[in-house]
Amino acid sequence: MKRMLRALYHVTKLLLIPLCLVLTFVYAMLQGGFVSWFLFYSMVPIGLYSLLLPFYALRNAEVKRITNQDEYVAGEPFVSTITIKRKFPFPLLYLVIEDELPPHFTNCRQTKMNKAILFPGLKRNFSFQYAIDTIPRGEHTFSSVRVKTGDLFGMMEKEVTFSVPDTFLVYPQYVDITYQQLENHFEQGALSANINLVKDSTISVGVRDYKPGDRFSWIDWKATARTNNIMTKEFEQQRSHNIMIFIDRTESPLFESVVTFTASIVRAVLKQNSPASFVSVGKERTFFPLDNGDSQLQQIFCHLAKVQADSVFPLSRSVEMELRKIYEPVTIILVTSDLSPDIQKAADYAAIQNRKLLVFIVKEKPNQLSHQELSILETLQKRKIFVNVVYENRYTNVFFEVSK
């Protein structure tokens, strides 16, 4: 029904144009004089243009989107140029062009607007450019460009939506961090990697779950009694620089800062060629196994570009599940914006497993810890668990605190 009404509306407007020409001609014939005939001859080209416009194949034009970069980092400017090429130079009085923006771009400040009016006339090729000052992190999809034209009085209008799909991945911001490789101390704390250590297979540095083939003498009876599971001692030669990084995807106003700091940590570790695995659990679980190098960095950054604050399970549950799957020595890094009882629970489980744990709390500015957070911080520090409160864009030397 709506289609029929729309078609009837367009037909009515199309018939109105020759009717106006006939009326002005009759008026000129009856009235006579210069003014009457001038009005008629003035209406003839306008009327003919309005009659021809609906038959012009604007859809045959070629529309392209050209951007200033192929890859972006959050906060960078986005500049796009929309170009239109026509095969037939039909005269166009005006042309309204609008590049339809992705949802996350609509609230961004624009130096030049994504909608413009051009007066191409007989030109076959023309373009316009718009700019967005800072773009947000994420995967953004452009779908189409709308082009609209019409006659002088707006009686006839023609609008075409061109499909111009483009997808851009905007990577998270990061800060250069000076990373120092860490090794597990005999009990708690850390040692710098450039310190020469004497390896002694008679010294136990941790415990892990029992695996077939382990010697009877390796069983740690105290840990076995404490956990009700058979636990095996880990010895000094098993020490490594392996890192496992967890990001807390709990909804928070500081989630973007958490992503930025996590990206900075990941980049610092992998640029030093240290092996690292990465765990991110929200509505879906994402796990990157232990690896190093640029390939691992690229994969994790791609994930961090898309990650959302959509956690449905406590972080402590994710930490517990992952630690049950690994047996080799590994340093755990937790990145969060809230030092909650759940983080304390995760730290307690890591301590039971004799895992080295680093907790980084991201805050906007100093003195923002709540009374509960201060209480948990004091409790963890008494247990010699490293907890560091870091502030936005002041991340450079966070690892030097660990080595003290």
Task: State what each model feature region is.
Residues 1-64:
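Extracellular/lumenal glycan-associated context and N-glycosylation machinery
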Residues 45-294, 331, 335, 349:
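An amphipathic, basic-hydrophobic helix/alpha-beta surface used to engage anionic
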Residues 267-404:
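Acidic, glycine-rich A-domain
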